[in-house]
Amino acid sequence: MYEYFEGIISEVTPSYVVVDVNGIGYKVFSPTPFAYKQGQKAKVYIEQIVRDTGITLYGFQDQDDKGLFLKLLSVSGIGPKSAMAIMAAEDSNSLAEAIEQGEVKYLTRFPGVGKKTASQIVLDLKGKLGDYVARLDKPENGEEISPALNDALLALIALGYTQKEVDRITPKLVEIEADTADQYIKKGLALLLKK
């Protein structure tokens, strides 16, 4: 029924935000509530779930995250709470990439996801998430990324940095001249530690 709410974030908690739209506060569960700041004007994309126990609103920063949430809900054995827990534990690009590559073991690290459910996620969604997979081939400025830089970016993700953190420093890494992935990794770590 709702596509999005645009209003002021009046409250931020570990599991939900309250969006004030013209004096009405909507409690919206979010996988990333701390991405919002209290007092900030924001557009929150909404999915409304109606159950016997009540109506619950789930909110996302963009249409892609909302779409991924809906794809997860289409998997047998995944409900809204499980889908939110999965999305809260990992950024959308990494999650979609793991599904596309059939990484069942990787998916079992999410709360409430056992081997059977992880296999079902891969079975149901593999090949359907191409839009969500990160494109490390080109940064936003359109320049080509060298194989050494691409290896370095993948290594930074493997070290535990999020896709968003790595995307933030990619344009700076493209500008430097380095011959090896090790050189890019050292510079990338220095940039990430600056924050």
From Swiss-Prot:
Pfam families in the record: HHH_5 (PF14520), RuvA_C (PF07499), RuvA_N (PF01330)
GO terms of molecular function: ATP binding; four-way junction DNA binding; four-way junction helicase activity
Region described as Domain I: 1-61
This protein's record includes keyword Cell inner membrane: no
Top-level taxon: Bacteria
Protein localization: Cytoplasm
InterPro entries: DNA_helicase_Holl-junc_RuvA_I, Hlx-hairpin-Hlx_DNA-bd_motif, NA-bd_OB-fold, RuvA, RuvA_2-like, RuvA_C, RuvA_C_sf
Alphabetically ordered keywords of this record: Cytoplasm, DNA damage, DNA recombination, DNA repair, DNA-binding
Region feature (Domain III): 146-195
Region (Domain II): 62-140
Primary location: cytoplasm
One of the protein's GO biological processes: DNA repair
Positions of the UniProt region annotated as Flexible linker: 141-146
GO cellular component: cytoplasm; Holliday junction helicase complex; Holliday junction resolvase complex
Family note: Belongs to the RuvA family.
General function of this protein: The RuvA-RuvB-RuvC complex processes Holliday junction (HJ) DNA during genetic recombination and DNA repair, while the RuvA-RuvB complex plays an important role in the rescue of blocked DNA replication forks via replication fork reversal (RFR). RuvA specifically binds to HJ cruciform DNA, conferring on it an open structure. The RuvB hexamer acts as an ATP-dependent pump, pulling dsDNA into and through the RuvAB complex. HJ branch migration allows RuvC to scan DNA until it finds its consensus sequence, where it cleaves and resolves the cruciform DNA.
Domain remarks: Has three domains with a flexible linker between the domains II and III and assumes an 'L' shape. Domain III is highly mobile and contacts RuvB.
Quaternary structure and partners: Homotetramer. Forms an RuvA(8)-RuvB(12)-Holliday junction (HJ) complex. HJ DNA is sandwiched between 2 RuvA tetramers; dsDNA enters through RuvA and exits via RuvB. An RuvB hexamer assembles on each DNA strand where it exits the tetramer. Each RuvB hexamer is contacted by two RuvA subunits (via domain III) on 2 adjacent RuvB subunits; this complex drives branch migration. In the full resolvosome a probable DNA-RuvA(4)-RuvB(12)-RuvC(2) complex forms which resolves the HJ.
Protein name (Swiss-Prot/TrEMBL): Holliday junction branch migration complex subunit RuvA
